[in-house]
C-alpha cells in the first residue's frame, strides 16, 4: 500500500512521459494495459524513497570490513538495541547497504506543526533531521522541546513564516523542536543547525550528518555502478565532465588507487569548491577540479587555456565520464515536479553538445560512460541511438557489473544493443513494508536483490572509441 500520492506533474509533462512509455514498440512488446500499469506504478514509486541507504566506502583510507565495523558501532549509537544489518554488495565490493524501515502507519499526529520545503522533506524521508533553512512555517506557540508533526509543502505554496497552512501537505513524521518559532523566524538570519530532531519518521533510516566523513560517501546505488563500469586503471588520465559534487570523481580516483590524474569540471564555482572539499576530506590527491563549462572543453588552438587545465587538446583522455545534466526525473523521493514541458525537454540539445566534446577529447581505444538520473527516453536510449548514428567511431559495449535492467524500447535500438545498456526502473518491484522484525528475518540475497531494483531511476551507456577523430566531427 502506498502512503504518498503519485508524483505531481504538470498535465503536459505527465502526458509527454506517458506517450514515451506507451510508445509503439513498448505496447507491441507487451500490451497497452501492461505498459499503462507500469507507467502508473513508476509515478507512485517516484514519490517514495528507495528501500536501502547506500554508502560507498573510501577504500583509499580504509578496508570495507573495517569501515563496516565502524558503521555498525554508529548505528548502535543511533538505534540502541535494534539490530540494523549492514550488507556488503557482492558485485560492488566497496558498497554497503543499510535497509530502511517503514512506512510506519501508526504515528500519532501532533497539534503543533512545522511545514518544510519539498527538498527538505525529501531529505527527511531518507534519514535527515530538519535543518532551520528548510523550515517554511511553524505553529504559533511552538517552543523548544515541543513534540511537533512535520509536513512537506510539496507544491511550494506555503508562505515563509506562516502560522498555519491549509494547502496540500504530506505528513513525514514527528520530531522534537530544538528551537522556538521566535528563534526560527525572528532570530539570527544565518541559523543553519537542526531545527527539528526527527524521532518518529514515517521512514526510519540512519542519519549520516558528519558520520565517518573521511571513510564513507553517501551515493545512490546506480551512481556507484558508473565508476565500476568505467573501470579506470592506475596511471590513466580521466575526465569527469559534469562532476559536482564529486561522487563519481572521488570513486574513480579511489578505484585508481589515487595514481594517475582525474580532471573534474563543473561550471558553478560553489559546486567546484564543494568537490575539492570532498576530495580533501577523502584524502585523494589525484583530482584536479576546475570551474569550467564542459561544452567548451575542447581546445581549438594551441594558445588558449589554463596550464594543465581546460580547454584540452583533442584525444587527451583515456576514459571519460559524462554524467550529463538532465531533467532528474528519476530522483526519489520526489512528490512534485513543477517544471514545464519546455524545461523537461530542454536537456537533450545540451547533452548532445557535451557528447560532441566528449568524443573528440577521448583517445582512440578509450571508454566513454554516459549516465543520467532521469527516466525519459529522449535523454537516454534516444541519445544512444543518436550517438551511434553521429559518431561512426563509437561502439556500444557490454557493461560490468550489469545490475540494472536492459534499455527501454522505442528509440530504434536493436535488442542486442538494449541488453548492453543499464536502465534502473523502480517500477519493477512492489512497495516494501519493512519493520525491524522482518529485517531480522530477511535473507542477505533478498536484500541485495531489493537494493538493485528499488533504487532511483537511472541510466548508463558505455561506449568504446574505435578510431581517431582528429579530423573535425561535423555538428548535426
From Swiss-Prot:
Signal peptide, first to last residue: none
EC number annotated for this UniProt entry: 2.1.1.-
Swiss-Prot/TrEMBL GO biological process terms: tRNA C5-cytosine methylation; tRNA methylation
Coiled coil regions, renumbered to chain: none
Organism listed in the record: Mus musculus (Mouse)
SMART domains associated with the record: PUA
Protein name in UniProt: tRNA (cytosine(72)-C(5))-methyltransferase NSUN6
Reaction(s) this enzyme catalyzes, per UniProt: cytidine(72) in tRNA(Thr) + S-adenosyl-L-methionine = 5-methylcytidine(72) in tRNA(Thr) + S-adenosyl-L-homocysteine + H(+); cytidine(72) in tRNA(Cys) + S-adenosyl-L-methionine = 5-methylcytidine(72) in tRNA(Cys) + S-adenosyl-L-homocysteine + H(+)
Amino acid at each position: 500500500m502506498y502512503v504518498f500520492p503519485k508524483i505531481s506533474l504538470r498535465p503536459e509533462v505527465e502526458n509527454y512521459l506517458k506517450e514515451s512509455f506507451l510508445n509503439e514498440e513498448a505496447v507491441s512488446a507487451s500490451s497497452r494495459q501492461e505498459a499503462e500499469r507500469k507507467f502508473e506504478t513508476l509515478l507512485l514509486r517516484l514519490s517514495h524513497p528507495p528501500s536501502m541507504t547506500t554508502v560507498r566506502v573510501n577504500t583509499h583510507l580504509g578496508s570495507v570490513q573495517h569501515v563496516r565495523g565502524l558503521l555498525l558501532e554508529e548505528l548502535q549509537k543511533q538505534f540502541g538495541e535494534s539490530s540494523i544489518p549492514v550488507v556488503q554488495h557482492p558485485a560492488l565490493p566497496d558498497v554497503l547497504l543499510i535497509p530502511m524501515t517503514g512506512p510506519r502507519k501508526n504515528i500519532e499526529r501532533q497539534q503543533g506543526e512545522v511545514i518544510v520545503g519539498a527538498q527538505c522533506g525529501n531529505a527527511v524521508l531518507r534519514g535527515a533531521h530538519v535543518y532551520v533553512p528548510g523550515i517554511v512555517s511553524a505553529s504559533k506557540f511552538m517552543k523548544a522541546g515541543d513534540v511537533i508533526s512535520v509536513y512537506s509543502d510539496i507544491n511550494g505554496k506555503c508562505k515563509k513564516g506562516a502560522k498555519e497552512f491549509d494547502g496540500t501537505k504530506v505528513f513525514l513524521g514527528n520530531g522534537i523542536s530544538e528551537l522556538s518559532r521566535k528563534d526560527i523566524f525572528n532570530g539570527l538570519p544565518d541559523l543553519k543547525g537542526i531545527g527539528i530532531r526527527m524521532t518518529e519518521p514515517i521512514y526510519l533510516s540512519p542519519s549520516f550528518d558528519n558520520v565517518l566523513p573521511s571513510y564513507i560517501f553517501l551515493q545512490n546505488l546506480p551512481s556507484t555502478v558508473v565508476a565500476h563500469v568505467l573501470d579506470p586503471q592506475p596511471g590513466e588520465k580521466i575526465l569527469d565532465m559534469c562532476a559536482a559534487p564529486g561522487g563519481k570523481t572521488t570513486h574513480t580516483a579511489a578505484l585508481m588507487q589515487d595514481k594517475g590524474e582525474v580532471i573534474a569540471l563543473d561550471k558553478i564555482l560553489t559546486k567546484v569548491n564543494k568537490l575539492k572539499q570532498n576530495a580533501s576530506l577523502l584524502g585523494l590527491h589525484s583530482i584536479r577540479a576546475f570551474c569550467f563549462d564542459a561544452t567548451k572543453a575542447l581546445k581549438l588552438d594551441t594558445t588558449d587555456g589554463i596550464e594543465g587545465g581546460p580547454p584540452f587538446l583533442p584525444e587527451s583522455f583515456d576514459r571519460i565520464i559524462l554524467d550529463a545534466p538532465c531533467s532528474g526525473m528519476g530522483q526519489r523521493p520526489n512528490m512534485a515536479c513543477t517544471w514545464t514541458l519546455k524545461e523537461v525537454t530542454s536537456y537533450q540539445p545540451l547533452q548532445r553538445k557535451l557528447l560532441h566534446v566528449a568524443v573528440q577529447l577521448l583517445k582512440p581505444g578509450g571508454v566513454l560512460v554516459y549516465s543520467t538520473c532521469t527516466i525519459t527516453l529522449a535523454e537516454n536510449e534516444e541519445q544512444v541511438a543518436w550517438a551511434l548514428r553521429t559518431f561512426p567511431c563509437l561502439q556500444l559495449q557490454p557493461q560490468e557489473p550489469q545490475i540494472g535492467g536492459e534499455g527501454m524500447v522505442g528509440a530504434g535500438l536493436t535488442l542486442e544493443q538494449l541488453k548492453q545498456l543499464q536502465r534502473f526502473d523502480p517500477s519493477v518491484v512492489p512497495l516494501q513494508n519493512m519493520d525491524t522484525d522482518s529485517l531480522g528475518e530477511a535473507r542477505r540475497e533478498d536484500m541485495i536483490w531489493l537494493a538493485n531494483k528499488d533504487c532511483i531511476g537511472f541510466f548508463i551507456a558505455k561506449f568504446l572509441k574505435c578510431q581517431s577523430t582528429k579530423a573535425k566531427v561535423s555538428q548535426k
